Amino acid sequence: MKVGIIGSGGREHAICHALNIIKKVKQIYCFPGNAGTARIAKNISVNLENFNELKYLIISNKIDLIVVGPEKPLVDGVVDFLEANKIKVFGPSKLASQLEGSKIFTKNLCEKYNIPTAKFGIFENIDDAVQFVCKAKYPLVIKADGLASGKGVYICENDFESKLAIKEIFDGKFGVAKNLLIEEFLRGEEMSYFIISDGKTIKKFGTAQDHKRVLEGDKGKNTGGMGAYSPSRLINEELDKKIMSRIIEPTIKGLNEMGTKYRGFLYVGLMIVENDPYLIEYNVRMGDPECQTILPKLKSDLLEIILSCCNEKLNETEIKWHNKKSLCVVLCSKGYPDKFKKNILIQNLNKIKLNQNEYCYHAGTNIIKEEVYAIGGRVLNFVCLSQNFLDARTKVINSINSLNWSGGFYRKDIGYKVIDE
């Protein structure tokens, strides 16, 4: 079977790696992929906004299945387009992808189906938003409505910070902004919860604790994710049941009533307040770096799981996991998430010795004249499975240090709440 993967990040390399070990998979194509996927798949350069070009490449290479990694093609409707052209594709429809594409869409769904979430207001212009925050209680949360690569969220402590956030959003920092949300600040701990669904059956696909802030101790600016560990230390049987019954099941039901089945991975961003879950956000794909953290724990055949979803037979498939802890640290280009240099040579990659249960997934990398260069903010993901998180983190940091790359930096405290406290 020939499989195509859309995307170029660490998530896509992790998916590529998981599919590459399956005997039934004869060839993998990545659109466009990175230096890591190039070792186990055929990378094909493509404009992901040109669906006709993508269709031509899929048909001409006789690809049997497409797996969509990132959110933008999903929100833009790539699944609907490929299905209309009789191409088997794994991922949610354009309408279902509005769960991530529009925070307002999701908030309205929460209201209709009584899904617990923070209280909120929707604002269409600067004046109304500023007028509201001047009378509001702090802290509060301000969010850009559309896609923002995980960075369009501000936690504001005063009027000055709120006004700056409002101005940046309406000035187009995260693309054209027609609306923004202002939410109450929930005091609790964040957790990432994953499921896979074919629109009828829902199955759990792991939990993780992401580290969004760029600096140690969860300080500094928001990023796409500096590292993660799995499982989350917050999860327990009672909380698990609440998440499924109060949040996920009503969401899938609501989409069905709108006329679209949710088929694909769903990433549920939660705030846990005294063991009660509140929805912060939905992402309509696996997280990054959570995907890199969770997939190495998967014991079952990923291709079989994906195909069962495409064929609405997920209820017939059992998903099994290795009973181990997993921890991921992201190596970033210096300067990230602000300006950083591109096309920086990464030496010593071949000198890294990865033992069993250790992985290095590429993200913002490219091959130029047979050498690997950093071209993105998040560059490499180092992952380790172990019986405990401290051992996993120690081995990951040893691997990063053996690389000795002067152009990068990373957080040394990933997992600190489960290891150091």
Show the residue positions of the predicted features.
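Generic C-terminus detector
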Residues: T365-K369, Y373-E421
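Short acidic-hydrophobic, aromatic-tinged amphipathic segments that line or gate anion-handling sites
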Residues: N43-E49, G121-N125, C156
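Active-site "cap" helix and flanking loop/linker of ATP-utilizing ligase/carboxylase catalytic domains
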Residues: M244-L266, N283-Q356, I368-E370
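A conserved helix-loop-beta module that forms one wall/lid of the active-site cleft
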Residues: F90-K151
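Short, charged, surface-exposed secondary-structure boundary motifs
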Residues: A38-A41, Y56, Q98-I104, L215-E216
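Internal nucleotide-binding/catalytic subdomain
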Residues: G152-C291
